[in-house]
Amino acid sequence: MQGRLSAWLAKHKLAHRPLGFDYQGTETLQIKAEDWVSIAVALYVYGFNYLRSQCAYDVAPGGSLASVYHLTKINDNADQPEEVCIKVFVPREDPRIPSVLRIWKGANFQERESYDMLGIFYESHPCLKRILMPESWIGWPLRKDYIAPDFYEIQDSH
């Protein structure tokens, strides 16, 4: 089912795939990593001026990784702000997504956390380094194929 935003993107020939609506009626779209920056700029111009959250998850063991963006269109006289959920899937072997920090400043720590936990590299992020784990940590703890070190290795890493 195509929503209002999907129709607008299609009208402007911006590549995407509608994924339907969530339980609250928020439209969900899939965007390819190589198209993400141009579509992010278009969404900002369209009025999505607030990045409510960005997160990432491991779709399946050995499968792709996903970076998820929840955008909100905020204006002064909106009782119900319009929202959209964007999903960008990348292969786990080379998980690269362009950073949207220059569009939404709130992406800074959120993209860093996704990098730290899942190893998604956000290209052109000015300070992409670990934010929760020590710099010496090896691996990506929230990947489903991650093998946790034993107790003594965890103690030695601090």
UniProtKB/Swiss-Prot annotation:
GO terms for molecular function: NADH dehydrogenase (ubiquinone) activity; quinone binding. It is an enzyme of class 7 (translocase). It comes from the Eukaryota. The keyword Amino-acid biosynthesis does not apply. PANTHER family: NADH DEHYDROGENASE [UBIQUINONE] IRON-SULFUR PROTEIN 3, MITOCHONDRIAL, NADH DEHYDROGENASE UBIQUINONE IRON-SULFUR PROTEIN 3. Belongs to the complex I 30 kDa subunit family. This is NAD(P)H-quinone oxidoreductase subunit J, chloroplastic. It comes from Cryptomeria japonica (Japanese cedar). The gene is ndhJ.
